[in-house]
Curated annotation (Swiss-Prot):
Gene3D superfamilies: Extracellular Endonuclease, subunit A. It is found in: Mitochondrion. The keyword Transit peptide applies. GO terms for cellular component: mitochondrial inner membrane; mitochondrial intermembrane space; mitochondrion; nucleus. The gene is cps-6. GO terms for biological process: apoptotic DNA fragmentation; DNA catabolic process; RNA catabolic process. This is Endonuclease G, mitochondrial.
Length: 308
C-alpha cells in the first residue's frame, strides 16, 4: 500500500462520490486511515506461474512481459494469466477479473499498420475451467455492455495484443450509454493521453461490489447477475494509474466510478479517491513494491516538494 492521498481534491472527490453516485455511508470512505503494514523488504514474494492462453498461438506472443508489466507488485495471485500486453487475475465466482494490469509506453501505444479492431471477436479464454467461464450469451439481451477492463485502445501495437483484450475474462458487465460508452471511455482516453507523454505508465483496473445502507439501517452487498453463468454485475469500478514522469518519479491517480449513468457534465476528477479507499474496497494491495517517496503527485496534488 502506498499510503493516503492528501489534499482537498481527494476529499472533494470522495464527498461527491459518496453523496451523489456511491452507496450510502460506506465505511471505506468514512475511515481511510492506513493500516500498519509489514515493510516490503521483509516480505519474500514469488511471482506466480503464469499461463499463456492456448486458444491463440503462444509462440506468437514472444517472451513474457509479466516482470515488466508487474514491476511494482502483484495486487493478488489468484488465477493469473499473462497476455502479450497485460496481466489479469480471474475470479471464478463472479466470472470476471479481480484485476487487470497494463504497462504502457509512448512506443507501445502507437497504432501499428494493419491492426484492425474490427477483426477482434469476443470469446472466452479456454485456459480457465469451462464451468467458470462467462459466455457471449450471458450478455445477450442483458442490458449491459461487455465492458473492457484493459482498454482495447491501449493495445494496438499488434493484432494479437488487441485481440487478447477481447477475451471475456477481460470483460465485465457495464451500463452502456452514460458509462461504458461515455464516462468510462473518457477515463480511458484521459489515461491514454497522459501515458503518451510519460516514460512508463502502469494501470490497474477492476470491479467493485460495495455495500449500501438500506431502510432497516443495515448495510448489504447486493449485485445483479446475468446469463446462465451468473456473471456478476459490479456496483462500481476502480482504476489506478501510475505515471513515471521522470526516471524514478511518479504521479498517481486513483478513481472509483459507479456502474451507472453519469452526466456528461461531470468531470472525471470528481471521482478521485485516496488509493487506500480503492485497496480497502477491492481487498488488494496496489503497487506495493513502489517506494512511497517516489510519488511526487497524487490526484493532481503535489506532495513532498516540487518536481521541477
Amino acid at each position: 500500500m502506498i499510503g493516503k492521498v492528501a489534499g482537498t481534491a481527494a476529499i472533494a472527490g470522495i464527498s461527491f462520490l459518496a453523496g451523489k453516485y456511491s452507496n450510502d455511508d460506506l465505511p471505506i470512505f468514512r475511515n481511510v486511515q492506513s493500516a500498519t503494514n509489514v515493510p516490503m523488504n521483509q516480505i519474500q514474494v514469488s511471482e506466480p506461474m503464469t499461463v499463456k492462453p492456448a486458444s491463440l498461438n503462444a509462440d506468437a506472443m514472444g517472451p513474457s512481459r509479466s516482470a515488466e508489466i508487474m514491476k511494482h507488485g502483484y495486487p493478488g495471485f489468484t488465477n493469473v494469466r499473462t497476455y502479450e500486453d497485460f496481466v489479469l487475475s480471474y475470479d471464478y465466482k463472479t466470472r470476471t477479473a479481480h484485476w487487470v494490469c497494463e504497462h504502457l509506453t509512448p512506443e507501445r501505444l502507437k497504432h501499428a499498420e494493419g491492426v484492425d479492431r474490427k477483426l477482434c471477436e469476443f470469446k472466452p479464454d479456454i485456459t480457465f475451467p469451462q464451468k467458470f467461464l462467462s459466455q457471449n450469451t450471458d450478455y445477450k439481451c442483458s442490458g449491459f455492455d461487455r465492458g473492457h477492463l484493459a482498454a482495447a485502445g491501449n493495445h494496438r501495437k499488434s493484432q494479437l495484443a488487441v485481440d487478447q483484450t477481447f477475451y471475456l475474462s477481460n470483460m465485465s458487465p457495464q451500463v452502456g450509454r452514460g458509462f461504458n460508452r461515455d464516462k468510462w471511455n473518457d477515463l480511458e482516453m484521459h489515461c491514454r493521453r497522459v501515458a503518451k507523454k510519460m516514460i512508463n505508465s502502469y494501470i490497474i483496473t477492476g470491479p467493485l461490489y460495495l455495500p449500501k445502507l438500506e431502510g432497516d439501517g443495515k448495510k448489504y452487498i447486493k449485485y445483479q447477475v446475468i446469463g446462465d453463468n451468473n456473471v456478476a454485475v459490479p456496483t462500481h469500478f476502480f482504476k489506478v494509474a501510475l505515471f513515471e514522469v521522470t526516471p524514478g518519479k511518479f504521479e498517481l491517480e486513483s478513481y472509483i466510478l459507479p456502474n451507472a449513468v453519469i452526466e456528461d457534465t461531470v468531470e472525471i476528477s470528481k471521482f478521485h479517491v485516496p488509493l487506500d479507499a480503492v485497496e480497502r474496497s477491492a481487498g488488494l494491495e496496489i503497487f506495493a513494491r513502489l517506494d512511497p517517496k517516489s510519488i511526487v503527485k497524487e490526484n493532481g496534488a503535489k506532495k513532498g516538494g516540487l518536481l521541477w
